[in-house]
Amino acid sequence: PSNVVELFKQFNCKILLSSDPNISGKFITSLIFGTCKGSGTANAGMYMGYAKELLEFLEAEAKTKCKDDQLNFNTLCRSRDDIKVDENHVIFENFKPTQVNNESNAPFVSYPGSPGLSRYSRAVTEYAQFVYIYILCLLIVSMVFLPQHKNLLVTTTVAATAFYALFADKSCTV
């Protein structure tokens, strides 16, 4: 559309990031990726801005130790005042895989592919680093309040710890 530049200028920023559709729910999405300045969570799939600032932003993202670009985008977004998230879908809209109504007035729209077993298994190894401590705490508290299930809970705790130690990506937490 011919008015994209004018729409972008109305945001009064140097970089505009698309808003995450919170596929896992707002709490889990915020827990894993954080937010951009306390507002919505930025999605790394669609963005626009001025060339100089975009180059600086993308170079900074490439230098981070964390392998997750979306977490990096949100972390960098919090450290810069010239970045905003298109929370009202004026320019960008990301749809959830489960959304039935896929109509949008946004000039740029993203429709996710069909999530399969490989995507879900990859998500478990990638995102375990963000939720492992909560799962571990829940299992320990469960042992205290459910002593009759102690054997199962201890086994689950050992298995979860072994999985985390052997397979989970820890690039964002170490």
Predicted regions and their residues:
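Short, flexible coil/linker elements and helix-boundary hinge sites characteristic
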Residues: 12, 33, 81, 146-149, ...
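Transmembrane alpha-helices
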Residues: 125-171
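Generic cytosolic/nucleocytoplasmic N-terminal low-complexity/intrinsically disordered segments
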Residues: 11-13, 104, 118, 149
